[in-house]
Amino acid sequence: MYNFLSCKKKSIILQVLLIICTYNILLNFVNIFVNNNEKNHKNKYENRIKSFYVEAYNWNFLEKWKSINTNEKLEYKINYNIGLNIDAEIGDFGDYNSDVKTDLILFKYDKDKLLSTIFIYVFSVKENKFIYHTEVSFEGKIMNVTAIDLNFDGALDVLVLFKDNKDSSKSNKYYVAAFLQNDNDQLEEIWNSKKKEQNDESITDNEEDNIYYTNIHPLICDINNDGLPDIIGQQSGGPDGFFRFIWINTRNGFKSFLWKNINIFKYSELDEITNPNSSAIVDINGDCKSDLVFTVYNSYEKRIGLEIWLNKIIDGKSFYVKYSQDYLLPPNSLQVLFGDFNGDGSIDLVVPTCVKSSFCNYCCVSDDKIYFIPNIQKKICDSSWKKPDETKCRPASNLCSESDFEFQQNLTDDFISVVDTSGLHLSGNADYPYYLSVGDIDDDGYLDLLITLKNDKGQKYVRIYKNELKIHYEENSLEVRGFYNFYQFVTSPEESVTDVYNAAFFDIFENGVLDILIFGKYITSNKKTKYAAVGFIRNNETDSLFLKSTALNGICVNDCYKEKDKITTKTLGGNAHGPTFKITVIDVNGVKSSRIGVQKSQSAHFPLQLPYVLFGLGRTSNYVEEFYVGMPTHEQKYYNMWVSIIPNSHIIVIPYPLNNSNKWQIQLSVNPSKKFYSILYITLICLSVIGVLIFILDRKEKVEDSKEELGFKSHFVIG
């Protein structure tokens, strides 16, 4: 008995020592990890490229925010070593080489040669930076770039909007050129509407529909349900002073058709699309099927509004049906943003406004505001214990059901956020209409804004405006959100930095954490203007989780090489416009909510949207219970649903075939935390120590048992 108690005491002492040992190992690992990070950042800072310099710091009044913990302040460190010293303008984002890394599509116009060049820079995992990949040049001045799969082969192609550089008139005459990625990863021009016009070559089956250019930046979406991206444009002329048309994609080019001659639109009176415009393909009524939204000049109200065309099935056939009335935007509206800003599962609007002046090419000079305009429709049913009334709410098992909707009409001060009171104004002008960048910086489930500002002296600022609850209306359970200055990036006061023309959220290392890319211009020592960019990397983590989702465009991915001459190695370059995602998540208080996101919803005026949807899940220890994806098709079955998705993962949806959603598949890859390997090493060390101790104690116990057994046998005499 004494030996047993002695052994037990020794076991307890060893366990205490084991805990102390584990704590010391963990502490040392954390210290080494932090010190290495600080050294790396210091070295990178010392080796920075000094041509384009930006500083960053937290905004002071953040200290009084009750909702932000001291431990949760964002920390951004500038990184000059990720290959962003590129003398070209940013055009779009996409996965060019199908390695699940987002690449850069850039361009530059040479005034002397009258040529534009498209550059592809891919992110190299080996070198941990963006590296040059390929380029292509053509005659014309680029006005917009869209990276998208044009011929349905899974490889990322490039669609360019350009002006004739020999046209001295100030008319908005935009032509289109299509560049396909060939088997050698190079871009080849396969269609050019300007060349078709010069050669007097017909691009339509009906001579009335022969259209070579558009007067607005077009909307890109699949109109005729073949999975190929089409183009909706507008031209001056006709009895109304304008007419709409569509360039239908034929895989190796486009054919033009007048809007009125296409039988999928329930035709009614049209208004003129504005220039600039922020038209979109986005789910307005919550049925997981994207609708068409155009920013138009309402001829009756003499104001800019949203013209909405709902994607509906009528008597077994698909139509776009015009909504009964336009939604009139606030006066002096700029580029409209679409997203689930209050986290209730419906697409809301965020509209920046300002007073402009013709003296600075219609830039903002006063009264800069941000309007939050909620989309009021059926929410998710709040209880799973009783049968829900589906006329008042959506059950989690049927989130993709159509609902009546209404955008908030009475926009009081509760719905308005003031941008700045110290003389800063929203960036952009008539030549470069500026979009705010949208993303959830802290994965709390609410979309924040990245805004470029300027003062009267020309100095540029980039700020993160945090999305916070402003007021809750009890009568209709409506959360009103506001946007507040949260984090600031300031350009160098030196005169060499002449402009910051754009900024965007970007997940550089594909870890579910949004970093910042800032794009600008500077003057070299020999007085030449060059483009450049800098990256700010998030170097701290919150305890919030995320879900990243990407939908392909409907190409076959698995086992389709049997039907082709060769194996297709590129499948992730679709950059599909309009797929809709809906998820449900339960927070730490047990409250279930739904979220919605739309992939690549806009295409005009360089919106710089990422080729995926990043959901912030907040603090939750649960799975994503339901995950829906809907494709912008005209099929009866256009969406599918999966359950129990692991957080902190990237889901790739393979909607093949497009006409049968029951056969759609998903691929899931889990993104480990930054501390995953440290935790793994510490766990292995602890398990090894525990294993050794168990072995020692087991051997000792067997020795003690052997001695006791011998002592017990000595009391017996064998005769």
Curated annotation (Swiss-Prot):
Residues 1-32 form the signal peptide. It is found in: Membrane. It is a single-pass type I membrane protein. Pfam families: C2_ITFG1 (PF23122), FG-GAP_3 (PF13517). Glycans are attached at N144, N277, N410, N540, N659. InterPro entries: FG-GAP, Integrin_alpha_N, Tip. Keywords: Glycoprotein, Membrane, Signal, Transmembrane, Transmembrane helix. It comes from the Eukaryota. Belongs to the TIP family. PANTHER family: T-CELL IMMUNOMODULATORY PROTEIN (PTHR13412:SF0), T-CELL IMMUNOMODULATORY PROTEIN HOMOLOG (PTHR13412). This is T-cell immunomodulatory protein homolog. It comes from Plasmodium falciparum (isolate 3D7).
